[in-house]
């Protein structure tokens, strides 16, 4: 039963979580291009 629950919840691995949250190398990969997280943070906090 535990294996069924884990399959249903689809747990993330640590490297996947770091990539989504912008950890690790600080680059967020998107479909069209790669954006540096610092660029996004600047755009949302500059004003």
From Swiss-Prot:
Q: Which Pfam families match?
A: L_biotic_typeA
- 2,3-didehydrobutyrine PTM sites in chain numbering: 30, 39
> The organism sits in which domain of life?
Bacteria
The answer to whether UniProt assigns keyword Cell cycle to this entry is no
Main localisation = secreted
Return the InterPro entries for the record.
Answer: Lantibiotic_typ-A_Lactobact
Q: Where is this cross-link: Lanthionine (Ser-Cys)?
A: 32-46
- GO CC, one annotated term: extracellular region
Intracellular or extracellular location(s): Secreted
On modification after translation, the UniProt record reads: Maturation of lantibiotics involves the enzymatic conversion of Thr, and Ser into dehydrated AA and the formation of thioether bonds with cysteine. This is followed by membrane translocation and cleavage of the modified precursor.
Q: Which UniProt keywords apply?
A: Antibiotic, Antimicrobial, Bacteriocin, Lantibiotic, Secreted, Signal, Thioether bond
**What terms describe the molecular function in GO for this protein?**
signaling receptor binding
Signal sequence region? 1-23
Question: Which GO terms fall under biological process for this protein?
Answer: defense response to Gram-positive bacterium; killing of cells of another organism; positive regulation of biosynthetic process of antibacterial peptides active against Gram-positive bacteria
Q: What biological function has been recorded for the protein in this entry?
A: Lanthionine-containing peptide antibiotic (lantibiotic) active on Gram-positive bacteria. The bactericidal activity of lantibiotics is based on depolarization of energized bacterial cytoplasmic membranes, initiated by the formation of aqueous transmembrane pores. Ruminococcin A is a broad spectrum bacteriocin exhibiting activity against a wide range of pathogenic clostridia and B.longum.
The name this protein carries in UniProt is Ruminococcin-A
Tell me the organism's taxonomic lineage: Bacteria, Bacillati, Bacillota, Clostridia, Lachnospirales
């Amino acid at each position: 039963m535990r294996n069924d629950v884990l399959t249903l919840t689809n747990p993330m691995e640590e490297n996947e979580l770091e990539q989504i949250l912008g950890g690790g190398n600080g680059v967020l990969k998107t479909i069209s291009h790669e954006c540096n997280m610092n660029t996004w943070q600047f755009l949302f906090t500059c004003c």
